[in-house]
Regions:
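Basic, alpha-helical nucleic-acid-binding regions used in initiation and control of genome expression
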Residues: 1-317
Length: 317
């Protein structure tokens, strides 16, 4: 099978351009990303254990989806309809291009079972209803995710998505002044308000946000919702990078500098907007100057000379 496919294009290009790997694999860490990609190249099905592909237990069986407007264009352009991978992004329910509701076909997305070849031209109807989304925020989010989906996958960055997101809330009200405490409940509240017109009001809850920040869970739509809310450009998500220094490091450096300038702990605390104990704690962790000990040296005493001098004194007395 691999040899037949490679006659058309290289296997790595086929995976990046014609599978869902860029959607599910983009936010995996470096090692898992490479492992999943190699699994797809080798076609050993091990990628299912690595990639965060959701198991649709509540919703039941998943089916391939299509956009009625895309199908019409395909028929006029190519003579037949076909499936688009951009319509299979779980969590995105409208076409990113035409903003109409995606329709469900009769072709199930199977797992370990053998599937029959279902030609899209015979499955996708000509008269499917076209329902345009009336939610601007849903359209904006779908386009944001689609733009990211089209980008190349970076295999070199060591930065995890959790680390990246932490850096993006630095300097905001969602992180303490020192940068060591996240206010996730406040973030969740603002996310709900920002996405209140999103159909089904699907916003990541507090527990999921915590897991995403801690690199314990990957949910593509939730990550994109968070990034779009924080104003992160799509380009920055294609190659994750961190600032030279964290907010915590910058805060501590400033506190130390102010201390060296002669300010007292309480003055520094008041200036930086934290409690005095926080500044004192930073001061304790700073290396102290080593004390310089001096050793007094004495000339070596001549005991014989001292005895002779002592005897002479006694005679004269």
């Amino acid at each position: 099978m691999c040899q037949i496919l490679e006659r058309v294009m290289p296997m790595d290009e086929l995976i990046e351009r014609h599978t869902m790997f860029p959607y599910y694999g983009r936010f995996c860490n470096k090692d898992k990303k490479k492992e999943a990609f190699e699994s797809l190249v080798n076609m050993d099905a091990n990628h299912k254990k690595i990639l965060p592909i959701p198991i649709m237990k509540k919703e039941g069986e998943r089916f391939l989806r299509y956009c009625p407007m895309c199908a019409k264009i395909d028929r006029n352009t190519y003579g037949e309809a076909y499936y688009h991978r951009s319509h299979q992004m779980v969590g995105v329910n409208i076409c990113p291009i035409h903003k109409c509701e995606l329709r469900r076909s009769t072709v199930a997305v199977v797992d370990n079972r053998l599937s029959r070849l279902e030609v899209p031209e015979f499955v996708i109807p000509n008269n499917a209803p076209i329902l345009i989304s009336n939610s601007p925020i849903e359209c904006q989010l779908a386009e944001y995710i689609y733009q990211l989906f089209q980008q190349n996958v970076d295999f070199d960055s060591e930065v995890t998505i959790g680390q990246f997101l932490k850096s993006k809330i630095e300097g905001t009200k969602y992180l303490s002044v020192r940068g060591e405490r996240r206010y996730v409940s406040l973030l969740y509240k603002d996310l709900c308000k920002y996405y209140q017109e999103l159909p089904q009001h699907t916003v990541p809850e507090v527990w999921l946000l915590q897991k995403i920040f801690n690199d314990q869970k990957i949910n593509v739509v939730s990550i994109c919702q968070l990034c779009m809310f924080l104003g992160v450009p799509v380009d920055e998500l294609t190659c994750l990078k961190l600032p030279p220094k964290t907010q915590t490091e910058l805060f501590e450096e400033k506190a130390v500098e102010m201390r060296k300038g002669g300010m007292r702990f309480n003055q520094i605390a008041q200036e930086l907007g934290v409690c005095t104990s926080t500044i004192q704690l930073i001061g304790k962790h700073q290396p102290r100057k080593a004390k310089v000990y001096t050793v007094k040296t004495h000339e070596k005493r001549n005991w014989e000379q001292m005895d002779h001098t002592s005897v002479e004194r006694q005679i004269h007395c």
